[in-house]
Amino acid sequence: MREATMKRALILIGLLALGLALAQKPKVVIGTGSTGGVFFYYGTALADILNKAGAAEAQPVQTGGSYDNLQLLRDRTAGTTYYCALTTTDSAYVAYTGEEPRFKDRPAKTQRVLFYMYPSFIHLVTTEKTGIKVVQDLKGKRVSTGQPGSSTENLALLVLQGARVKPESFAKRERLPVAEGAKALAEGTLDAFFWVGGVPTSSIVELSQTLARKGDRIYLVPIDPKSTTAQVAMKKFPGLVDPYTVPKSVYNTRTDVRGLATGNIVVCPESLPAETGYAIMKAVFENLDTLRTAVAAAKDTSLEATAKLYGKLPIPFHPGAERYLKEKGLIK
């Protein structure tokens, strides 16, 4: 009798343990970016959507951007904690292939694509009073090329290479995140800064308003996609860096600004369970209006844009994302 009771108790304990294990959601940590940049706000809104939908226990973390996020994905994913990364497509590409120095010895081969977010414009921001009109005018000026090792810095250096402008020719080179770059430009301690980010970027919108109050005006240096200045970046990342035009209404510039943009994607580790990847896709695209209300740049987040990226990158899609896209009839 006692033996039978003990067996029933053990079975009950086992079933309870199994139930708890099944009920426990995977923990998803989302690498975002610096405050003032779109990655930070997008990642925060994404985590909120996943939590409310019950897709995962999601937590956003502030980082230096794409490469930091990809390193977290590669190095910190363990057990039932999965690090997902918001990243530009060019950063994901060179991290996967090992062309980026910090991934040379250990490429981020475990990353898998979930969905496309929006394009990131290569902003070269200055003011009308600096007299900077083209990239070559940066010589002798105080310029920030973005945070060290960031996608902003890497693309800025490619633009400078195309324009035959060496950072050594600057009066002073800074390596600031977008919010600090905008603050320095507004205060007159910087002449221009690069930023690769969504349109609009809140820090640059605020900068435009600040400059207007001071009797100055923001100026985005145009980059002709057909110029040699643009071709270095476009050839480095064929199909991943494309022409893009920022309407004058976005930052209150005098004219629309032609330039270049790279895409942004959400990637996850290969080990993320297929059902969790599917649940993330379902949560995001069933709550797209909520995401777009929270982040203006999310107007470009769509299943169609995600499907267009399928097969364009050497990075495989996550099985959960593939299943969702197939159910919607967007891929075979």
Regions found by a protein language model. Name each.
Residues M1-A9:
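Positively charged n-region of N-terminal signal peptides that target proteins for export
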Residues K104-M117, K248-V257:
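A structural signal for short loop-to-beta-strand junctions that line the ligand-binding cleft
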